[in-house]
Each structure stands twice: as C-alpha cells, then as structure tokens.
C-alpha cells in the first residue's frame, strides 16, 4: 500500500494579491473591448488606502482607469473604511507607459501566423482524470471553499464575514487514488462583533459541510478554522497585494510544475498566459480521449520566434501509447504558434477578469476547457479504448 498526503491552497477574491490580479485583468478587458490588437502588460500594487498600476500598453483604446479600479474594488466588497480598505476613498496612482518599439517590431508581422512570442519562457499544462473537470482534487476543493465563502458573504448568510480569506485542504491518496480528506483549513476575515465560537460554527455549517463530499470525510478529518483566533484586520490593510503572486493557486495547486510566468494583466500575445491555456487544452483532451490518465506538457519559446523551441510530455506511466506518439498527435492537431493559440482558443475577447479568481482552469465555459479534440486524438492514435 502506497499512501501519501497532498495539499493545495486557495485564496478569496478579497485577498490582496487577488485584488491586484482582478484590477490588472479588468484593465486588460477594458482595453481589449476597444482594441483587440492591443499589447498590454498591466501590474497592480495595492496597500492601505492606495492602488498603484503600472506597466506597458500599446493601444488606441481610451479607458477610465480610476473608474475601473474603484468599481472592481466595490464588486469585491471593500466599500467601508472599517474593512481596512474603501473603494470610494483610496488613492489611485497610474504609471502605465508605452510598450518598447523594439518588442513591437519583433511581434508584428505581415503574416500574423509568423508573429513571434512576446518573450522567451517555459510553460506547463496539466490534466488528470481524478475529477470530472480533469483537475486535481486538492486545488478543486480549495477553490470551491473560497467560492462558497464569497457566496455566503455576499448573500448575507454570514453577515460578519469580510472579503479576505484563505483555504487549504490535504487529501489522502492510496495507490494514487483519493481515499479521504486529512485536514481542512479556513481562515476568514470577519467583523469585530463575532465571537470565535460562533464564527467557527458558522463556517463549518455554511461553508465546509455543503462543499466537501461526505465519502471523503471521517472522524479522523481535522479542521482548523481561524486557528490563530481573531482576523479583523485583513485585505490590503493587513498585507500588500501584487499582481502575479498566486501562480500556484491560479493553476494546479502544486500538483503540476509551473514555468514561473504569471497570467493576469497580460494580453494573449504573451505566451506565459496564452500557451498555459493552450497546454491545459491539449492535456485535457489527451486525458479525455483516454490516451493517458494524467498528462503534463512543457513547451518553450524564444522572443520574436513563432514556432515553439521544444515540447515535452510526461504521463506518469499512465499512457496508452508512447509519449513520442502523443507529441506527434499534438503537432498534428494543435497550432502552438503564438497567433495559432489565439485563433484556436479565441483569446482576443475580453474574458479575463473572471479568470483572475478561483483558478484559471476548470471553468467549463472557457474555450481552453473544451474537449472537442478528444475523439480525434483517440481515433488518430490507432488503438481502441
């Protein structure tokens, strides 16, 4: 018997780093709404009473950055200085400049399919058949707990909840299959008046119990709810926030490797983002086809060069055909050039604000979550599954 524990964490939409991600992607969406060919790299820094946005943009779009930022913060729920941050009164500093002409020349080509990558980099994609969404269970349920935290807060079911929160969940695996949940952790910001006992009871009854499958819960499952006690000071007052600091929460919860590039605030010419979406699409279709139970793909690019430099695949011994044949199928069925990624997944639409919370993967309405190539891959493999 090979038993082990695996843990993933998530954070709420009101976590400072996630506020920053949402602001960056809100600005990106506003620009893409007016100018689909825009080049955008928008970073956000947030701290008590202040938001600073910076980066590089090449676009003719005219947007009201201050209004976008204030509305985003209001949507998240920071509307009162008692929460440590107020959308209506925070200072906003804008230091966005033009993109370098040298980079622009390297990307823009007469034939868009010859468009080079916006930077060098390594990118990973992953899928597993351990859940219906082809995502690892630990990050899936860590995200679900945070989605539920937001829901009960905004519906006033637990009126003392505040926007900042974190979750962490540890699964028990036996022979690579889930057999239970070992530990659940939730820390949630709250108002002054709630006592710790009522807080823990409310979070258990309204957030944890409705989300976690009973088949994985036992009398040995451990729960830590606000384990340090009071959590009144949170959000940007408790910690500064920065775009791109939650890359493991954004992806696979540590179950797969990560190339290091973040997503939010970047237009799809940046392969850090577009190739990560594409490789999720490729890996998910391989697993959905039955050609592997788990699939991790690495790709690399050079700045200004259209074709990928390398492709590597790892199937953890679960493949039904050789990894070499799988790579051939990838080349035959997916265009992984930067412009090819954009066309394949229709990435010029203003869809990115929603990706900035609760993970970029598993939301089935996004194009990189389609499994429309699964049957093609299975038929092309030459084997019956």
UniProtKB/Swiss-Prot annotation:
Classification via CDD domains: S-AdoMet_synt (cd18079)
Binding annotation for Mg(2+): 17
Binding site for K(+): 43
Keywords: ATP-binding, Cytoplasm, Magnesium, Metal-binding, Nucleotide-binding, One-carbon metabolism, Potassium, Transferase
Subcellular localization(s) per the UniProt record: Cytoplasm
GO molecular function: ATP binding; magnesium ion binding; methionine adenosyltransferase activity
Top EC group: transferase
List of residues binding ATP: 15, 164-166, 230-231, 239, 245-246, 262, 266
EC numbers: 2.5.1.6
Cofactor binding summary note: Binds 2 divalent ions per subunit. Binds 1 potassium ion per subunit.
Cofactor: Mg(2+); K(+)
Binding site for L-methionine: 56, 99, 239, 270
Pathway recorded for this protein: Amino-acid biosynthesis; S-adenosyl-L-methionine biosynthesis; S-adenosyl-L-methionine from L-methionine: step 1/1
PANTHER family (UniProt xref): S-ADENOSYLMETHIONINE SYNTHETASE (PTHR11964)
UniProt-listed NCBIfam families: metK (TIGR01034)
Family: Belongs to the AdoMet synthase family.
Function, as annotated: Catalyzes the formation of S-adenosylmethionine (AdoMet) from methionine and ATP. The overall synthetic reaction is composed of two sequential steps, AdoMet formation and the subsequent tripolyphosphate hydrolysis which occurs prior to release of AdoMet from the enzyme.
Quaternary assembly: Homotetramer; dimer of dimers.
Protein name: S-adenosylmethionine synthase
